[in-house]
Amino acid sequence: MDRKVAVHEDGYPVVSWVPEEGEMMDQKGKDQVKDRGQWTNKMEFVLSVAGEIIGLGNVWRFPYLCYKNGGGAFFIPYFIFFFSCGIPVFFLEVALGQYSSQGSVTAWRKICPLLQGIGMASVVIESYLNIYYIIILAWALFYLFSSFTWELPWTTCTNSWNTEHCVDFLNHSSARGVSSSENFTSPVMEFWERRVLGITSGIHDLGSLRWELALCLLLAWIICYFCIWKGVKSTGKVVYFTATFPYLMLIILLIRGVTLPGAYQGIVFYLKPDLLRLKDPQVWMDAGTQIFFSFAICQGCLTALGSYNKYHNNCYRDSIALCFLNSATSFVAGFVVFSILGFMSQEQGIPISEVAESGPGLAFIAFPKAVTMMPLSQLWSCLFFIMLLFLGLDSQFVCMECLVTASMDMFPQQLRKSGRRDVLILAISVLCYLMGLLLVTEGGMYIFQLFDYYASSGICLLFLSLFEVICIGWVYGADRFYDNVEDMIGYRPWPLVKISWLFLTPGLCLATFFFSLSKYTPLKYNNVYMYPSWGYSIGWLLAFSSMACVPLFIIITFLKTQGSFKKRLRRLITPDPSLPQPGRRPPQDGSSAQNCSSSPAKQELIAWEKETHL
């Protein structure tokens, strides 16, 4: 056995060798390990990222936050966070994936072994998203199937699930005798709570399984499975349709919305600036958390998708374009939402503030109610829920793809072989489906709200973003990462990006993080139902399970590394030498970058790379 023995600068032996036939892995085993693959072209990457970041939050969260926080004045804090946090962290994650050609866990492990917990935390958040986000698709499918009827089932109070408190306010003869003090409900509310959810009195009573939702959930998982089962080869093709079709639906709904009576008042309500609201710190916190939510930051998705890029792809230009596309979509979606809410307000003779909602309330109560007031209501209902379905679908299967990528990069010898990927995807899909069945019980909505409020909350994303920019800006070194980016795209990005990594982003993330904690209010379902103490404990356990990965893996890696404290620290903040070095093209045949020849200048750079900025 022919080994080459070197000595590490700390005095520990470093052994590297090429295994002989029969040692460690035979040649047949090598051939079975498949390459990671790459996007066929840039458009596949752009559409995949667009499909991931442009989702339901653009339609049901941003417009509501804009109206609630001062209308047009909300854009001031929004764009401050957009330029100082959104673009810099978005670009950081995409560039990290492209530079390392690794998923979220192994990319951070190679950049800084001490902070590999950042990648593990993103996997935890991805896992939670895979369980609960797809429930929204099950609801959308249920509404879509219910739209293929002569009369929309949430239009009248004559259905079997309606109660004596149901009042159809569109039918003025039935609504005339109802006083404002009566305890009434609308048919659209009863359809949502009694027909779709069958909701119980609280989280303590989960009730029985809603088998129709369980079947819709199964269909959603089957669709997601076949969207990604062939890796980026299939994902890259599917997104041509799933990422672009929602824009067609959005344009159709926009044209319909702005032509409705009352649309102008709704749009004015959406954009009318109230500069006094900028004095409220809550407005700034909402702007910051919306940026992190809508850009899919700290979920590992951007790193995984970027890892399939060619090494010299201009990820800087792509990142900026995608960030602007995401925000522009949110802005246009606001016109769709508030033009229809303005129409509802005029038809019912009530203020817009009483019909404006966010989240599931907007998608499954306000909009279904709005389409009942339009001619050809079945058509508009189908178009809306198809748009909702595709907005959520590509976000879901791209998130699933990123979880699979992280797993395969962590265990390439075991998983990157013929047929193993299909089995892995099937196993994750079945496991997530079985866990998701808990959320389609009669009390499942209470569990869904816990996941949504705590598991992927702004607090978690702000915490991880803080460590990401500290790792790249201060530990690995912002200048060093700029050198890596320059090697990939041919020039250095705008200096504001580096300034943001070093100062602006960590400062804003830290301030917003502590403010979020100080202003924490316990979750209430429908602003009425208070969870029991053990329910809130489960919620905080979901939140801390991701954030705890960072300090936990710092401790674990320290304990597993030998040497004095100083030597261990130095070794754990030294990047992996197999990472591409500036001026040297990364190997295309899977061989180690260490075996590539380099000039004296490059060797000097490699020696310098061992130093850190800590």
UniProtKB/Swiss-Prot annotation:
The secretion signal range is none
The stretches that face the Extracellular side, renumbered to this chain, are 138-210
**Quaternary structure?**
Interacts with LIN7C.
Tissues with expression:
Predominantly expressed in the liver (sinusoidal hepatocyte plasma membranes), also present in the renal medulla, where it localizes to the basolateral membranes of collecting ducts (particularly at the papilla tip) and the thick ascending limbs of Henle (at protein level). Some expression is detected in the leptomeninges, but no expression is detected in brain parenchyma, brain blood vessels, ependymal cells, the renal cortex and the intestine.
Instruction: Spell out the PROSITE patterns in the cross-references.
Output: NA_NEUROTRAN_SYMP_1 (PS00610), NA_NEUROTRAN_SYMP_2 (PS00754), NA_NEUROTRAN_SYMP_3 (PS50267)
**What topology does the record note for this protein and the membrane?**
Multi-pass membrane protein
Q: Which cysteines are joined by disulfide bonds?
A: C157-C166
Report the protein name in the record.
Sodium- and chloride-dependent betaine transporter
Q: Pfam families per the record?
A: SNF (PF00209)
Q: What does this protein do?
A: Transporter that mediates cellular uptake of betaine and GABA in a sodium- and chloride-dependent process. May have a role in regulation of GABAergic transmission in the brain through the reuptake of GABA into presynaptic terminals, as well as in osmotic regulation. Probably also involved in renal and hepatic osmotic regulation.
User: What chemistry does it catalyse, as a reaction equation?
Assistant: 4-aminobutanoate(out) + chloride(out) + 3 Na(+)(out) = 4-aminobutanoate(in) + chloride(in) + 3 Na(+)(in); glycine betaine(out) + 2 chloride(out) + 3 Na(+)(out) = glycine betaine(in) + 2 chloride(in) + 3 Na(+)(in)
Family in the record: Belongs to the sodium:neurotransmitter symporter (SNF) (TC 2.A.22) family. SLC6A12 subfamily.
Topological domains, Cytoplasmic: 1-44, 557-614
Q: Where is this region: Disordered?
A: 574-602
| Gene symbol of the encoding locus | Slc6a12
Polar residues bias spans: 589-601
Q: What is its main location?
A: membrane
GO BP term, example: gamma-aminobutyric acid transport
* Listed InterPro entries: Na/ntran_symport, Na/ntran_symport_betaine, SNS_sf
